[in-house]
Structures are given as C-alpha cells and as structure tokens.
Amino acid sequence: MNVEDEVDLMKKMIIGRKIGMTQVFAEDGAAIPVTAIEVEPSVITQKKTVEKDGYDAIQLGYGRIKQNKATKPLQGHFAKADKGCFRILKEMRCDQIQEYELGQEITLDIFESGEMVDITGTTKGKGFAGVIKRHGFRGGRSSHGSMFHRAPGSIGASAYPSRVFKGKKLPGQMGNKQKTVKNLMIWSLRPERNLILIRGAVPGARNGYLFIKQSAKA
C-alpha cells in the first residue's frame, strides 16, 4: 500500500506530544509563532470490524512504556500487536479495514506542509475560578456603596421557575477540558526529528498529548 492510499484510508490522523512554542521567519522576514509537536510513529494495536464490533475502526497506540507500567489486561491486549506497551490509545474510524495490519506503524509522512488540521488536546487546569476569571464577567462597582464586587449576581427567580437553568455561567472548575482548535496550518515537517511545526497555539501544557487530524473544513 503506497503513502497516498494510506492517507486516504487514515483520514490523516496521528497522535503527538506538545514540546512548546517558538518562532520561525518567513521569506519576507516576518516572525511566525509556531508550536512544535513531537510525532513518534503510532502503532495499530487493534482492528475493529462491522461483523464483530458493529463498525470499522483501528486503534492507535502512542508513547511506549515499560511492560510493568501497564495493567495485566492491557499487557494481554498489547501482546496481540507485539510492539510493546503504550501510554495513549486512540480509536479512529476508517473505511477499508482490511488494508491494515496489527503492529503497522503510522508516521508523520501522511501530512504535508501547508495542510490544514484540527488539533484536540486537554487545556491547562486553572482550578476553582470565579465568574470574572472563568467567564469574563464585568463585576460590580468598586466604591459608591456597592455591596458586591466580584459576585455573579442573581442566578434566577424564586417563585418561577424556582430553579437554576442548565448552562448558567457560575463559578467552578476552569480548564482541564478537552478542546479542539480547527483550521491550523502545518508550517513545516521535520521528519529527521519527528517534529511537526504548527502555526499558532494549540491547547494544553508542555508534554500534553495531542490528536492531529485533517481539518473537516479544509
């Protein structure tokens, strides 16, 4: 199977690890902010079929770990591919499942410079936050007899509806949520170092795991 066929079947998705941000310079001298993502080869650890599972999909493993770091059930699961144990597993739908083999490696060669991708990651956790920090509320006056400054104010009426509507913006956990940023451009590929440079910022902290797939709107 050649690379072009593999790209079509894979829908161009791979797993990576965020290294950090830097800048590169365009031909006209403009400084371009980019995010460096380490993309080691992902390994197919499982094949799912319509007959057995109700749909066709492959499971990718990323980030090798020692065997004793995986649970016994996962050790048995990984043994089928015979490529070691992995920290991250990600399932992906595909059309022609018969074209794949257990243990097959997927590399960053499926992408090209200039392509648009959607990147999913886990945002930085900020802990418990109030409505001003979490939702950008304006807050109350600082003086002239104001009785509230950073409080949210009324969250609903008493007699009717006698409840707080779902989705009401309130204080609570900020960050540490899965987020997808769409239509980011691949600035360049560095296969010799297993790196992808993405123009702009991506979700998450350094060393966070990212799922990179072909943009749905490209």
From Swiss-Prot:
<protein>
    <recommendedName>
        <fullName>Large ribosomal subunit protein uL3</fullName>
    </recommendedName>
</protein>
<dbReference type="InterPro" id="IPR009000">
    <property type="entry name" value="Transl_B-barrel_sf"/>
</dbReference>
<keyword id="KW-0699">rRNA-binding</keyword>
<keyword id="KW-0689">Ribosomal protein</keyword>
<dbReference type="GO" id="GO:0019843">
    <property type="term" value="F:rRNA binding"/>
</dbReference>
<dbReference type="Pfam" id="PF00297">
    <property type="entry name" value="Ribosomal_L3"/>
</dbReference>
<dbReference type="GO" id="GO:0006412">
    <property type="term" value="P:translation"/>
</dbReference>
<comment type="similarity">
    <text>Belongs to the universal ribosomal protein uL3 family.</text>
</comment>
<keyword id="KW-0694">RNA-binding</keyword>
<dbReference type="GO" id="GO:0003735">
    <property type="term" value="F:structural constituent of ribosome"/>
</dbReference>
<dbReference type="InterPro" id="IPR019926">
    <property type="entry name" value="Ribosomal_uL3_CS"/>
</dbReference>
<dbReference type="GO" id="GO:0022625">
    <property type="term" value="C:cytosolic large ribosomal subunit"/>
</dbReference>
<keyword id="KW-0687">Ribonucleoprotein</keyword>
<dbReference type="InterPro" id="IPR019927">
    <property type="entry name" value="Ribosomal_uL3_bac/org-type"/>
</dbReference>
<dbReference type="InterPro" id="IPR000597">
    <property type="entry name" value="Ribosomal_uL3"/>
</dbReference>
<comment type="function">
    <text>One of the primary rRNA binding proteins, it binds directly near the 3'-end of the 23S rRNA, where it nucleates assembly of the 50S subunit.</text>
</comment>
<comment type="subunit">
    <text>Part of the 50S ribosomal subunit. Forms a cluster with proteins L14 and L19.</text>
</comment>
